Amino acid sequence: MKIRPLHDRIVVRRKEEETATAGGIILPGAAAEKPNQGVVISVGTGRILDNGSVQALAVNEGDVVVFGKYSGQNTIDIDGEELLILNESDIYGVLEA
C-alpha cells in the first residue's frame, strides 16, 4: 500500500535507531533516542499560497532530511512499517553526500 500526502505534507521513514554508542556501549531500547533523520518516501503537491497558487516543496523523494527532535508525532502504519507524516516546516534541512 502507498500513501500520497496532501499539500505541504511529507512522508518520512525514520532512520534506524542507534543501539550502541561510539565507544561500543550497548544501549537498552528505552535509553536510545529516536533518530531525527529519515528518508523521504512521498511528498505532497505543495503549499497553497494566499493567492491560490501552489508553491512546490523543497524536498524530493529519496532525500535524507533532518527534522526536530519532537517532530513526527503524526505516524501511520503501512504494511507493518511506522512512517512519519511531517509538514515541510518541520524539516530543518536536507543532508547531501
UniProtKB/Swiss-Prot annotation:
The name of this protein is Co-chaperonin GroES
Q: Which compartments is it annotated to reside in?
A: Cytoplasm
Q: What does this protein do?
A: Together with the chaperonin GroEL, plays an essential role in assisting protein folding. The GroEL-GroES system forms a nano-cage that allows encapsulation of the non-native substrate proteins and provides a physical environment optimized to promote and accelerate protein folding. GroES binds to the apical surface of the GroEL ring, thereby capping the opening of the GroEL channel.
Species of origin reads: Oleispira antarctica
Family note = Belongs to the GroES chaperonin family.
Q: Which CDD domains match?
A: cpn10 (cd00320)
Gene Ontology biological process terms from the UniProt entry: chaperone cofactor-dependent protein refolding
Predominantly, its location class is: cytoplasm
Q: Which UniProt keywords apply?
A: Chaperone, Cytoplasm
Molecular function, one GO term: protein folding chaperone
Q: Which PANTHER family match?
A: 10 KDA HEAT SHOCK PROTEIN, CO-CHAPERONIN GROES
Q: What binding partners and quaternary form does the record give? A: Heptamer of 7 subunits arranged in a ring. Interacts with the chaperonin GroEL.
Q: Which InterPro entries match?
A: Chaperonin_GroES, Chaperonin_GroES_sf, Chaprnonin_Cpn10_CS, GroES-like_sf
One cellular component term (GO) for this entry is: cytoplasm
Q: Which Pfam families match?
A: Cpn10 (PF00166)
The protein's superkingdom reads Bacteria
